[in-house]
Amino acid sequence: MLKNLSPSWTQVYYNAIEGYFWSPELIGRGATGNPKPWHEWHEGLLKKELPLNHILNLFFALTQQGTRDRCVSHLTGIPLTGMQFVPSVSVIQTVSSALTQPDLIFVSGSRLAFVELKVGSASNLDQFAKYVLAGVRLRAEYPEIEHVHLAVVTRPGREATVWGSRQYADIATLKAKAQSMLLDESTAWQSAAMKKFARDSSAETKRAMADAVEAISVRVVSYNELDQALAGEQSRSGEEDALVSGLRSELSARKLVSLGNTNRI
């Protein structure tokens, strides 16, 4: 019975949000008239990407080093060790919030890894280019970084359309399009940040950017991959890990993993 009274740590996160829901003056917000009941807001939050970003930020900030390394390695497809979690706000001045704010950032020695989380929306060519540019700027600030990796995590079955079009299901095609736009000095980007880059950057800078497009490793996976990595951590430890089990429960509650994964929770 006592176990049933102990909530998952992710529920504690939502409880904290509920506190601000009932006391908005604590964050300088005025009360709104006739708000929807909290449970309706909670149900809505389970469909949003931002709370999931927060939860995964907390998980990777608090989890053990080995778990962090193995999960990031599983997502990127690259064996990585010593990966440190870096809050996005720590690099905003270098990257520029107008460019992009990576969902998850990890760094270890010569390697930098970005993880982009998708729940309901798709990514696009501009967002890919902005991640490449973020890597270029961070490498300029931290010369020890030699390799940049990007993992995009989406719902099962959406891997082929995560860039908004099946024509980019092949990463090589995605890279080729980005490079051609850079080398042809195209201004046909969609985002203000990339339009500004195309307008203000020299031909040499654009060539360097095109080289970075070629060099970045990109992998698109579903949340099943993350869940499988977490399941592996549970099997490895042989005992209950509240952080891992809580995150798996969150992915299941959000219906981000397929039935083949959820029945192992």
Where do the language-model regions lie?
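Charged, terminal alpha-helix-loop-beta segments
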Residues: M1-I265
